[in-house]
Amino acid sequence: MTYTYKYPRPAVTADCVVITRETEPKVLLIQRGCMPFKGDWAFPGGFMNMDETTEQCAIRELEEETGLRLSNVHQIGAYSKVDRDPRGRTITVAYLTIIDKPIAVTGQDDAAKAEWWSLSDLPHLAFDHYDIMQDAIRVYAQAVEEYEKIQHDRFKEQKERMHELSKQIREQCAHVQDLCSNFTKKQ
C-alpha cells in the first residue's frame, strides 16, 4: 500500500557557493540559460533527485553546470522564503567550499556561462542568492579567521619545539665541550 500525504510537498534544491582564498577573493557564478531569471547570475545549483542528499545534489549540480568537481562542501543554511522561486514552493540548501585560486570552468547543462567574479564587483543575482551570499561571506570570514588561528598556533608550536630543540642542542654541546675539556686535562 502506498501512503500519500495530505500536505503539499515543496521542491528541494541545493546551491554551491565556491569562494577562493585570495587577497581579492572571487566567487564562482553561472549565468542562467533558461527561465526563470534567464541571463541573470546565480550560484551553481538545481533540483535534488529522490535518491540523493542535498550535499550530493550540490556537488552534482556544481559539476554539471561548471565542470568543476569538488567533494568537500559545508552546509551554510536552508532558505525557504515562500516566494523565493517563481516556479513554485522551493526550499534550497546552500553549501560553501573554499579553494585556493580560480580553476578553469565552462558553462554546461542549463548554465549559459560560468565565471569567477570578484566579491567587490558582483553582478545582479537571481532568486534570493544575495541572502545566500551574505551568509556564505560570514562563514567564509569565520573559516579564514580559524585557518589563520590554526596557522598561528602551529607556528607558535613549531617555535616552542625549535626553542626546546635548541636548548637540548646547547646542553649537548656543553656536555661535549666538558668531555673534551676533561679529556684534554687528562693528557
Regions found by a protein language model. Give the residues of each.
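Acidic/polar alpha-helix N-cap and adjacent early helical turns
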Residues: 142-159
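Unchanged
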Residues: 48-147
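N-terminal strand-loop-strand
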Residues: 2-42, 55, 70
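Long, low-complexity or tandemly repetitive, helically biased scaffold regions used
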Residues: 183-185
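Short linear regulatory motifs and low-complexity interaction segments
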Residues: 154-176, 180
